[in-house]
């Protein structure tokens, strides 16, 4: 098990997949980082040499905003939008979808479970 950017990456996974355990690194960034570090995509994490791990860690730390920094930046962006009172900030404050999705039906994930209203029945 290797540790990159404060995250334990399972040793039995391919490096390409293992790097996606880090917040802020998806499949595409993973491939870019491996290419820059000169590591094959098919290599298993347990088979990486110390030199390869050092090169990979250095590239990821210097090139990408990941883990705590990324989470902090996203949280501050949301906080700023809420404070200035823009439309997206209002949607965040109310716990509704932010990016223009419909809410007449669906949006249950953000709205939470249904609250039944007493005395409201469907007209026939």
Swiss-Prot record:
GO terms for biological process: translation. It comes from the Bacteria. Keywords: Ribonucleoprotein, Ribosomal protein, RNA-binding, rRNA-binding, tRNA-binding. GO terms for cellular component: cytosol; small ribosomal subunit. The keyword tRNA-binding applies. GO terms for molecular function: rRNA binding; structural constituent of ribosome; tRNA binding. It holds the Pfam family Ribosomal_S13. Residues 111-124 have a biased composition (Basic residues). Residues 100-109 have a biased composition (Polar residues). The keyword tRNA processing does not apply. Residues 95-124 are annotated as: Disordered. HAMAP family: Ribosomal_uS13 (MF_01315). Belongs to the universal ribosomal protein uS13 family. Located at the top of the head of the 30S subunit, it contacts several helices of the 16S rRNA. In the 70S ribosome it contacts the 23S rRNA (bridge B1a) and protein L5 of the 50S subunit (bridge B1b), connecting the 2 subunits; these bridges are implicated in subunit movement. Contacts the tRNAs in the A and P-sites. PANTHER family: 30S RIBOSOMAL PROTEIN S13/40S RIBOSOMAL PROTEIN S18, SMALL RIBOSOMAL SUBUNIT PROTEIN US13M. Part of the 30S ribosomal subunit. Forms a loose heterodimer with protein S19. Forms two bridges to the 50S subunit in the 70S ribosome. This is Small ribosomal subunit protein uS13.
């Amino acid at each position: 098990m290797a540790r990159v950017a404060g995250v334990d990456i399972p040793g039995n996974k391919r490096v390409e997949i293992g790097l996606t355990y880090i917040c802020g690194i998806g499949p595409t960034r993973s491939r870019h980082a491996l290419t820059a570090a000169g590591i094959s995509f098919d290599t298993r994490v347990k088979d990486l040499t110390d030199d390869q791990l050092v090169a990979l860690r250095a590239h990821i730390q210097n090139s990408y905003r990941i883990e705590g920094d990324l989470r902090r930046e996203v949280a501050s962006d949301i906080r700023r939008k809420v404070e200035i009172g823009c439309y997206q900030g209002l949607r965040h404050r109310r716990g509704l979808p932010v990016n223009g999705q419909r809410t007449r039906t669906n949006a249950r994930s953000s709205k939470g479970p249904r609250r039944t209203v007493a005395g409201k029945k469907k007209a026939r």
